[in-house]
Each structure stands twice: as structure tokens, then as C-alpha cells.
Amino acid sequence: MGTKLGVPNLWEILNKKKIKATFFFTVGPDNMGRHFWRLIKPKFLFKMFRINPFKIYGLNILRSGFIGKGKNIGKICKNEIKSASKDHEIGLHAWDHFSWQTWINMFSKKKIIKHINLGKNALQHIIKYPVTCFASPGWRTNEYVLRTLKNNFNFSYNSDCRGSNLFFPYLGDGKIGSLQIPVTLPTFDEVINIKTTIKKYNSFIIKLIKTQLNFSVYTIHAEIEGMKYKKEFEEFLNIAINEGINFCRLKDLIPKEIENIPIYKINHKTIPGRDGWIAYQQKIIK
């Protein structure tokens, strides 16, 4: 399990480099094994051949929740989550990651609220302080979800989509949603053996960071960079630090004055290397 095994490794690496980061945790059932049913989709099947999931994740992670209900991540990984919370910003990723990523477009308002409440309450019970940020599983959200989150939860920001800069999402009725801090860089599994190789991956990401003017938001996964490729991740940090790249928590990107942060739409699109759609930042609303 990524949280159980990968988070302590990431925590150790980041602390050794004196880097503060933001961790988003899934704290409900581990149903990753249910993604096996997506093998009937050609794009997902190709991705599995491309990244070799058995080598990266291991059989125990891949079979979690394949049949029956997966183990409760928050309960069996509470010590790992609590340790990370002592030095880093903690946010909610999901109660049930698989369910949200697969069916969020069919979720009712009641179900959205239930998922967030279950996750938020479980995470707060572990870390013993309020959860103030949220990141949608698989970068999947929509206007209905954003409105529900804005009206029912007091998150200081969300990180629900891909994009280039801080913005407020337009909700279509003259209102805006909670502040968004979008992810600006691709993930390991999206580009390996498509745009780069494992040996060249760190250089590939560093070059992208240098082309992004304001800031870069880089997503890593405990089950990848915290396990199989933890050595490569530490090498990435060494290169970045030597290149003068600074790291911070996501909340540190929020300016004191937020009145001039622009308003954008959130739309859906597909991207190379990822099965299905993601939410992304689209054209400014005047």
C-alpha cells in the first residue's frame, strides 16, 4: 500500500532536504484493484503495458478491493499519516478514490457531501486539526461538484484540475468557486515511454519547470516516487536544488491579497498518457 510504505520514505527524503510539501490523503477503502475492470478499454490496457504496474506497484496494491471491500486506509495507516502531518501540509484527497474517479459525474449533491464528510472527519480524527484543502481524485471535478464544495465546506483552496496559475473557477451563475491551485506538470505514469524514459525523466521534468513562469505544481505518488522510484525522486530533488529551484507547500503560493486573482472556467479534456478525462483551466471570463 502506497500510504503505508511510500509515505514514510517520502517524509524521510523531504525532511532530509528540509523541504515542506503538501500531502493529500485518501482515508477510506482501498479499492485500487477495481481498476482491473478498465483493462477492457484499449487506452488503459496500453498504459498498463507501458508502465508495467506489477513492477511499480506490486501485487498487494493492485489487488486491493478487487473482490469485496478494500481495507480502510485511514485506520491501518493512521501512524504514517500522523507522522507526515507534523512537518507538512495535509489535505483530503478522497474517501473512496476509485468511486470518485469513476462515477463523480453521476454523484448527487448528497453523495458528494457524504464522501467529503467521511474523508474530512476521518482525516481530522487522525491529524487532530482542521482539514482546509482538497484535491479531487484523478483531477476529476465539474461545475456541480465545485458549487457543492463551495456551499458546504470551508476549504481555503482546492487543487482539482490541471492548469497554469491560481484562479477562481466560474460557476456559470455569476458566482465563483473556491480558489484553485492547479497542477502544472505531468505525472510519471503519463509520460514514461511516451515522451521520455525512466533514465531521462528527471531532466525532462526539470526542463518543463524552467519553462513555467509563475510556479510549478508537481504531483508525485507514494506508491511510485515513494517506493519503486524513491532513489530517482531523491536524485530529482538534488538536481532541482542545485539548479536553484525552491520548494514550498501549496498554501504558501496563495498571496495575501487575492482580489487580483483571475477567474477562469473549468472544462474537461483528455491528455496523452492518461485514460479518460481530466478537469482543466480554460479561458478567462471577463
Curated annotation (Swiss-Prot):
Keyword field contains Chaperone: no
GO terms of molecular function: hydrolase activity, acting on carbon-nitrogen (but not peptide) bonds, in linear amides
InterPro entries, alphabetized: ArnD, Glyco_hydro/deAcase_b/a-brl, NODB_dom
Reaction catalysis annotation: 4-deoxy-4-formamido-alpha-L-arabinopyranosyl di-trans,octa-cis-undecaprenyl phosphate + H2O = 4-amino-4-deoxy-alpha-L-arabinopyranosyl di-trans,octa-cis-undecaprenyl phosphate + formate
Domain NodB homology as annotated: residue spans: 1-248
One cellular-component annotation, GO: membrane
Annotated Pfam families: Polysacc_deac_1
The keyword Lipid metabolism appears for this protein: yes
SUPFAM superfamilies xref list: Glycoside hydrolase/deacetylase (SSF88713)
Keywords: Antibiotic resistance, Hydrolase, Lipid A biosynthesis, Lipid biosynthesis, Lipid metabolism, Lipopolysaccharide biosynthesis
Pathway given in the UniProt record: Glycolipid biosynthesis; 4-amino-4-deoxy-alpha-L-arabinose undecaprenyl phosphate biosynthesis; 4-amino-4-deoxy-alpha-L-arabinose undecaprenyl phosphate from UDP-4-deoxy-4-formamido-beta-L-arabinose and undecaprenyl phosphate: step 2/2; Bacterial outer membrane biogenesis; lipopolysaccharide biosynthesis
BP-aspect Gene Ontology terms: 4-amino-4-deoxy-alpha-L-arabinopyranosyl undecaprenyl phosphate biosynthetic process; lipid A biosynthetic process; lipopolysaccharide biosynthetic process; response to antibiotic
Enzyme class: hydrolase
UniProt EC number: 3.5.1.n3
Function: Catalyzes the deformylation of 4-deoxy-4-formamido-L-arabinose-phosphoundecaprenol to 4-amino-4-deoxy-L-arabinose-phosphoundecaprenol. The modified arabinose is attached to lipid A and is required for resistance to polymyxin and cationic antimicrobial peptides.
Similarity remark: Belongs to the polysaccharide deacetylase family. ArnD deformylase subfamily.
Official protein name in the record: Probable 4-deoxy-4-formamido-L-arabinose-phosphoundecaprenol deformylase ArnD
Source organism (scientific name): Wigglesworthia glossinidia brevipalpis
Lineage: Bacteria, Pseudomonadati, Pseudomonadota, Gammaproteobacteria, Enterobacterales
